[in-house]
């Protein structure tokens, strides 16, 4: 996959959100890592993550979309599948 591909951008930003916004040790995060059992996210972390994804990636996921993601890879795919918002702010 090319370095500048959208998938790599989403992956890098998601790892940044996990590290910076949710204080996750990303050295153990893989696409197969389960968000709750392996990464340790709880309901508060999901809410913070939802806001961070919107702010940093311009993608709005519904609560249902976010909660349907079991793994980091599922979350990456859900983000990549959503259209990015353009902001005039």
UniProtKB/Swiss-Prot annotation:
Chief location: cytoplasm
Organism superkingdom: Bacteria
Alphabetical UniProt keywords: Cytoplasm, Phosphopantetheine, Phosphoprotein
Domain Carrier: 8-83
UniProt KW Phosphoprotein keyword: yes
SUPFAM superfamilies in the cross-refs: ACP-like
Modification note: 4'-phosphopantetheine is transferred from CoA to a specific serine of apo-ACP, leading to the activated holo-ACP form.
GO cellular component: cytoplasm
Location in the cell: Cytoplasm
Database matches in Gene3D superfamilies: ACP-like
Residue numbers carrying O-(pantetheine 4'-phosphoryl)serine: 43
Pathway entry: Siderophore biosynthesis; mycobactin biosynthesis
Physiological role: Acyl carrier protein involved in the formation of acyl-S-ACP intermediates within the mycobactin biosynthesis process.
Name this polypeptide is given: Acyl carrier protein MbtL
The organism of origin for this protein: Mycolicibacterium paratuberculosis (strain ATCC BAA-968 / K-10)
């Amino acid at each position: 996959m090319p370095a500048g591909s959208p998938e790599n951008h989403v992956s890098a930003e998601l790892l940044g959100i996990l590290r910076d916004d949710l204080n996750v040790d990303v050295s153990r995060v893989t696409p197969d890592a389960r968000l709750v059992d392996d990464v340790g996210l709880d309901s508060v972390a999901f809410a913070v993550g939802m806001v961070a994804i919107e702010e940093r990636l311009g993608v709005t996921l519904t609560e249902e979309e976010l909660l349907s993601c079991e793994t980091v890879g599922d979350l990456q795919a859900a983000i990549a599948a959503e259209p990015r918002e353009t902001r005039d702010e």
